[in-house]
Structure formats: structure tokens, C-alpha cells
Amino acid sequence: MSLKLTKEGAYGYVSVLISKSPNLALLLEIIESDSPIDIQTAISRGILGSEYSLFLQMKSIDDIDEAIYNFYKYYLENLIKYIPRPYDNFINCFIEVFDLDKVISMIFILEKQKLRSRYIISQIEPLIEYIVYSKKSIGNLPLYTVCLSANKGQTVLDVVKCFTKIYIDRVANTLHSISEVELIENSLKIFYLFSSLRSYRYILSCRMLKSTCNIEIKDFIKEMGMPTPIALLAIEKINKIYEHIKKDPTFALIHELKSIYEQLKSLLYSPYSFIDRLTYLLIHKFYESMFIRYLAMNKYSWR
């Protein structure tokens, strides 16, 4: 028996999920506050729902990371069951960002250990199999393993760029398939902006590890093949983020969300646009997961 809703029914369902989601602006205030609160207090004040109480049980950073990853992947994979085609494929591709972040973090950890580049690259394929594809068809694996050719002169950052471009192309292609049934311009613009800001985070991580990152963000974004107006907007926002974080990069995530927040909210102003509403929910949940992680780790003070 199919659980798929009609497009109209899915619009209402996603609207309810948005209304029940924590307020991102409020989470930002909590993280930045001189008197921050913990998850338990946030639940008791109604800022978070009772379902977030499971993060109170975690005893280590690894436990927290695994619990948050599983919580949000399950939430979004469960959403796919109810969303009609072709929107379900958009969700399926978008949520690979959770896996992408996880794999890229592991790549930088390997590089921090100052292992030879070819050795690092040889370790990435089993890493992808374990993290990304352990519950998926092996037929999907070549989509990303094409980045692991380990050509002479290939760097870890080259692999990261390749992963990122494949991800962006996959999601953009699903959006273009949706353009046959409704306008996608707003969602596509916000997705490209979101992806640009994530790319900047990857470059920041690379530089913080004192790795070889001989690339400017404008060149990185250009290589992603984004439309020029969106690329210029992304670079403008990234330059502003840099001015805020150049003395302390631990503020990067906060300023990343602040730089996209108003445009993200604008997706809710498109009357009867299901794809805009769905895109809002997916990006909201990604940033929400990041802030819940900070609360769960008691990382409240940013000063």
C-alpha cells in the first residue's frame, strides 16, 4: 500500500513539520547568549520538543555525533515515504549532504595525521562504503568513487571538490526535473547559495588543519559551475563571513546561517510553492542539526 500523499497533501504535511521545528533564530540567540541554556532547559521551556530528550543520554562526542546523524537521517528518510514523485528524489539526493559532511570531516582527520596523499585517497573508498552506502545499493557507489582516481598530483582538496561538484549536480538535476511541474528558481538559488557556504566551510576546515589549500573560494565556486549571478552573491556573503571570523573561526557556523537566513525564510513567502517549502525544510533541518549538536555538547559560549 502506497503511503504517498498528493502534492496538495504533501504541502500541508511539510507545512506542519515546519511549524513544529525549532526556531533557528532562537537557537542562534541561545548559542550566542552569555547565559546559555542546555537541552533539558530548552525542552522544559518549549523551545525543543520532547523527542530531543534522547540527546541527554549521550556520554561522549562520538555518541552525540552518531545520535544526531541517525536522528536527522531517519527523520528525512521517513519524510521520503510520504512525498510524491519527483519531489522524493530531490529529498533523497539533498540528504547526502549529511554523509558528505561526515566523509569530508574524516578525510581532513586523515590528512591531519600527515599521511601521504595517495594513502589517504586509498582509504576513502571503504570509508564511503561504510558511512554513505552501507544501507544503499552498491550501484550508487561509482557516482562518488570516480573522484578517487588517485592521479599523480591529486590532492585531498581535489577529492573534496569532486565530491562537492557531484553532490551539487545531483541535487540541481533533480530540481530541474521538478521544473516540469512548478517553478524552481527560488529553490535553486537558495540551494546554490547553501552549497557555496558549505564549500567555504570545507576550505576553512582545510586551512585550520594547516593543510595545503592553494585555492580561493571564488575559484572553488567557479569550478562548481554555478550561474554567475548566484556565484557573485555567494562570494559577497562569504567575504562578509570572513570579516566576522578572521580572528576567531569558531564563529563560522553562526555567521554562515546568518548570511543565508533571510533568503531562506523568503522561500516560505512563495504562495502555494511546494518545492520552495520543501527546500526550506531540508536546509532548516541541516542547520538545526548543527545547533542541536552544540547544545548537546554543552558548547554554548562563543566568546
Question: What are these model-predicted stretches?
Answer:
Residues 1-303:
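N-terminal domain-start signal
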